[in-house]
């Protein structure tokens, strides 16, 4: 029973550690004495502007959404454990590709 409970706890921890998300809200700006809400989101990684109700992928493997309430970004991949000497995420596809850093030709 202890082993079963430990496996459930481990599975829960593993499931919650698969990726990261963050959110940001808009701040109203004063223009001509009136509060004006922005109509674009600014990508925090490359400072590009994105229209409301749009979705984009960043060069840092995040998928971001620009909503009326603000923006949210989440990893496009689930995290797996880091193994020293191995690369686990391809920055172009944001997919897991484990291979030795000293021999990238041997991909798994």
UniProtKB/Swiss-Prot annotation:
Keyword Secreted attached: yes
Record function comment: May serve as a self-defense protein against the toxic effects of the snake venom during accidental envenomation. Does not show inhibitory activity towards brevilysin H6.
Keywords: Disulfide bond, Secreted, Signal
InterPro entries referenced in this protein's UniProt entry, alphabetically: PSP94
Any matching Pfam family: PSP94
Main location: secreted
Natural source organism: Protobothrops flavoviridis
Leader peptide range in chain numbering: 1-19
Name of this protein: Small serum protein 5
Compartments where found: Secreted
Intrachain S-S bonds: 21-74, 41-66, 61-94, 64-73
Family of the protein in this entry: Belongs to the beta-microseminoprotein family.
GO CC, alphabetical: extracellular region
Lineage: Eukaryota, Metazoa, Chordata, Craniata, Vertebrata
Gene3D superfamilies assigned to the protein according to its UniProt record, in alphabetical order: Beta-microseminoprotein (PSP94) domain
